[in-house]
Amino acid sequence: MPTINQLVRHGRKVIKEKSKSPALQGHPQKRGVCVRVSTMTPKKPNSALRKIARVRLSNGIEVTAYIPGIGHNLQEHSVVLVRGGRVKDLPGIRYKIIRGALDAAGVENRKQSRSKYGAKRPKK
């Protein structure tokens, strides 16, 4: 326990909170170019081939981002918008690609949660 005098001299040190998406450098989203598009297997109890892309952001940092939704049109040199947000069963993946923005098309035949997947309203 510090004395009053020690607190007057030095004060309390503020603990800075660590960013969960440091590559975005405080921005909500960043534009990037796909360097590699591939699949990855999730951690133990789950089994699948999750779609991922290695993206070089506009600030020069290269990150691995998850491609959400069923099916995608991304390939090398596609320009994408990346946001923060991890995928719980893929270690080391802390970013997601925004569907329906730039070169990433929205998910086809999506009826619910359309705004999260860039899907247009279906015709009646």
Swiss-Prot record:
Subunit-level organization: Part of the 30S ribosomal subunit. Contacts proteins S8 and S17. May interact with IF1 in the 30S initiation complex.
What does this protein do, in the record's words?
With S4 and S5 plays an important role in translational accuracy.
List the gene name.
Answer: rpsL
The protein's UniProt keywords, in alphabetical order, are:
Methylation, Ribonucleoprotein, Ribosomal protein, RNA-binding, rRNA-binding, tRNA-binding
- Residues with the 3-methylthioaspartic acid modification: 89
- Classification via Gene3D superfamilies: Nucleic acid-binding proteins (2.40.50.140)
Species assigned in the record: Thermosipho africanus (strain TCF52B)
Check the record and name the SUPFAM superfamilies matching this protein. Nucleic acid-binding proteins
Is-annotated flag, keyword NADP? Answer: no
Q: What is this protein called?
A: Small ribosomal subunit protein uS12
GO CC annotations? small ribosomal subunit
Q: List, in alphabetical order, the GO biological process terms annotated in this UniProt record.
A: translation
This entry's Gene Ontology molecular function terms read: rRNA binding; structural constituent of ribosome; tRNA binding
Instruction: Spell out the family assignment given in the record's similarity comment.
Output: Belongs to the universal ribosomal protein uS12 family.
Keyword Ribonucleoprotein listed? The answer is yes
